[in-house]
Amino acid sequence: MPSIKLQSSDGEIFEVDVEIAKQSVTIKTMLEDLGMDDEGDDDPVPLPNVNAAILKKVIQWCTHHKDDPPPPEDDENKEKRTDDIPVWDQEFLKVDQGTLFELILAANYLDIKGLLDVTCKTVANMIKGKTPEEIRKTFNIKNDFTEEEEAQVRKENQWCEEK
């Protein structure tokens, strides 16, 4: 199987099977634009928004999911589920918050829908059922609202709380 070289933002080169790399719509488009559809090339494809540690994790995820069917298109009318993360992905995403957020940014930049979905669902599960104070604690967010501002926000968004 032909391979290509991907270069991380910190200069590390990764040799990857073309089909695995093409799970990224961004890379697939780059290869098509450069006329490198199926045959490898010696020049690395620069990925300035992804460092080596994160690119290594992205490649690991893509390799594991190489035979998966393409993820379905989002249906805006359909409620999104967050309880359907495969066990392998749950284990893979047991990382620190910084790494998880870097994976979200990389999946978004590289346009890898499946990875973006599971990383975002993981964050959604970290928030689900928590009070604003618990969410702030989980993500180390400082509350910079005054009591008056907080009361105003609660009043404006009261409809959200109605059951």
From Swiss-Prot:
Phosphothreonine found at: 131
Family under the similarity heading: Belongs to the SKP1 family.
One term of GO molecular function: beta-catenin binding
Pathway membership, UniProt: Protein modification; protein ubiquitination
Gene Ontology BP term (one): protein monoubiquitination
Protein name: S-phase kinase-associated protein 1
Keyword tRNA processing recorded: no
Region (Disordered): 63-83
SUPFAM superfamilies in the record: POZ domain (SSF54695), Skp1 dimerisation domain-like (SSF81382)
Alphabetical list of Pfam families matching this protein: Skp1, Skp1_POZ
Region Interaction with the F-box domain of F-box proteins, residue ranges: 104-163
Modification note: Undergoes autophagy-mediated degradation in the liver in a time-dependent manner.
Keywords on record: Host-virus interaction, Isopeptide bond, Phosphoprotein, Ubl conjugation, Ubl conjugation pathway
Description of how the protein assembles with itself and partners: Interacts with KDM2B, forming heterodimers. The KDM2B-SKP1 heterodimeric complex interacts with the PCGF1-BCORL heterodimeric complex to form a homotetrameric polycomb repression complex 1 (PRC1.1). Component of multiple SCF (SKP1-CUL1-F-box) E3 ubiquitin-protein ligase complexes formed of CUL1, SKP1, RBX1 and a variable F-box domain-containing protein as substrate-specific subunit. Component of the SCF(FBXW11) complex containing FBXW11. Component of the SCF(SKP2) complex containing SKP2, in which it interacts directly with SKP1, SKP2 and RBX1.
